[in-house]
């Protein structure tokens, strides 16, 4: 049995959006939630953010549900495997990893790729590009 670490926030605005974050580090997940909430507040968006810690939880969350944006922030091969598995199940995938996987992200045509550490500016740019469909940077 798995436990989905669910943290939901709603911001009232013109349209709603659902985002899920997969990161095995609780403090990094919380930081990303804060960055996304700040971005949503500035854009006056209604938003729901859910979080999970690994592929098994993410796969369960993706099953039978369409998310607006899926964010995978896992290092190494685990990140590659998770991003590769999540990509066919999501319209927009943001992958956060190290430079070694940048070429693979480009080949996979993920919505956006950037390197750790995560900053508010990087996250906001990734969200904007993913929504506009601008591809990997």
Predicted regions: what is each one?
Residues 1-16:
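Short, Lys/Arg-enriched N-terminal segments with co-localized hydrophobic residues
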Residues 13-14, 62-67, 87-88:
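Flexible, charged surface loops at secondary-structure boundaries
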Residues 23:
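Conserved acidic carboxylate
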Residues 26-50:
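Two-component/phosphorelay signaling modules centered on CheY-like receiver
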Residues 30, 60, 103-104:
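Alpha-helical elements of the RecA-like P-loop NTPase motor core of helicases
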Residues 51-69:
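Acidic, metal-coordinating helix/loop segments flanking the phosphotransfer/catalytic sites
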Residues 68-136:
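CheY-like receiver
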């Amino acid at each position: 049995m798995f436990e989905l670490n669910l943290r939901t926030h709603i911001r009232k605005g013109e349209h709603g959006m659902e985002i899920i974050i997969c990161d095995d580090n609780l403090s990094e997940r919380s930081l990303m939630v804060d960055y996304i909430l700040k971005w949503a507040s500035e854009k006056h968006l209604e938003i729901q953010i859910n979080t999970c810690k690994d592929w098994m939880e993410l796969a369960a969350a993706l099953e039978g549900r369409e998310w607006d944006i899926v964010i995978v922030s896992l290092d190494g091969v685990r990140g590659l495997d998770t991003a590769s598995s999540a990509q066919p199940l999501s319209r927009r995938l943001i992958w956060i990893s190290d430079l070694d996987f940048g070429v693979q992200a480009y080949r996979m045509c993920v919505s956006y790729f950037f390197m750790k550490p995560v900053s508010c500016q990087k996250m906001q740019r990734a969200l904007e590009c993913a929504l506009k469909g601008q591809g990997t940077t």
